[in-house]
């Protein structure tokens, strides 16, 4: 997995509508907030994302709140976004 360049990120972002590129600690990250009707549904979604992450051995930051889950993907090892982040975002969107 190689860290994506700014040009590669710009080319790939249309594949993940609803997601945003953010920068934290000098690293590009893929971020999206999902809305739900209640905490139980948000928690269930968090667990399903966790299952996907375990299967792929690629783990996001997950913030679960009442009616909302924020998912942030990036590679700790590469220090920014990688193609796997786009792939995982797409899989998460399909849940």
Model-inferred region functions:
Residues 40-47:
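Short amphipathic alpha-helices within nucleic acid-binding modules
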Residues 21-22, 48-60:
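Short arginine-rich
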Residues 64-68:
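Short Gly/Ser/Thr- and Asp/Glu-enriched loop/turn motifs at secondary-structure junctions
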Residues 1-37:
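N-terminal first-folded block
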Residues 70-95:
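C-terminal structural segments of small proteins and small subunits
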Residues 47-48, 90:
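Solvent-exposed alpha-helix faces
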Residues 31-40, 69-77:
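Alpha-helical scaffold segments that form or flank carboxylate-/histidine-based iron centers
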């Amino acid at each position: 997995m190689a860290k994506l360049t700014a040009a590669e990120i710009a080319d790939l972002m249309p594949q993940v509508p609803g997601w945003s590129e953010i920068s934290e600690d000098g690293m590009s990250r893929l971020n999206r907030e999902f809305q739900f009707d209640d905490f139980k549904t948000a928690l269930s979604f968090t667990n399903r994302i966790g299952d996907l992450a375990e299967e792929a051995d690629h783990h996001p930051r997950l913030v679960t709140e009442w009616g909302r889950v924020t998912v942030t993907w990036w590679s700790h090892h590469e220090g920014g976004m990688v193609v796997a982040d786009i792939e995982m975002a797409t899989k998460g969107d399909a849940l």
